[in-house]
Every structure is written in C-alpha cells, then in structure tokens.
C-alpha cells in the first residue's frame, strides 16, 4: 500500500478513485498528572512520553487508514493530511486522504 502526501505518485497512473478515507484517535491528556509527574522526560521543552504517544497514535491510524483503503479495493492513498486538535484534556489525531487504484 502506497501512502503519500502528494496528489499523485510519480511513475504511476491513477486508474480509479475509490473515495475519501479517514481515521481518528483520541488520546487522554492529564497535564497535571502526566506532564508535571514526568518532568524528567522533558528535554528542551519536549516531552518524550507525549511524543511517543503521538507517534503510536499516528502509526495506528495510518494502519487503520490502509485497511479502510484496502476494503474499498484501493492500493494507494494520496493527498494524506494530518490534524492535531486539543479539546479539554483530550488530543484528537486525525488523518485523511483519497483511496485510489494505481498501476
């Protein structure tokens, strides 16, 4: 399964558009407990613990996106976009793109 942020895949011809695919993951964030309790994880203003959670969430929803595209009969997803939104103590990670068949 080819995944790309571009609207085309160089050297490949798009044969069919299968539609928009999207996936989301919600991560609970308790700033007082998680951030302040893990001050040792913060290096240069970055939290290794939260970065790991974000990476895991992003990888999980990408795999789910690929599965959704496969279920539509696609072999690639083009125009991938990510969004990160904070709402109260939750972080929403979203990904979407267009499922296509390429040759």
Curated annotation (Swiss-Prot):
> Gene3D superfamilies, per this entry?
Hypothetical protein apc22750. Chain B
Q: Name one Pfam family in it.
A: YbjQ_1
Which SUPFAM superfamilies does UniProt cross-reference here? YbjQ-like
Query: What family does this belong to?
Result: Belongs to the UPF0145 family.
User: What protein name does the entry list?
Assistant: UPF0145 protein PERMA_0324
Record the organism: Persephonella marina (strain DSM 14350 / EX-H1)
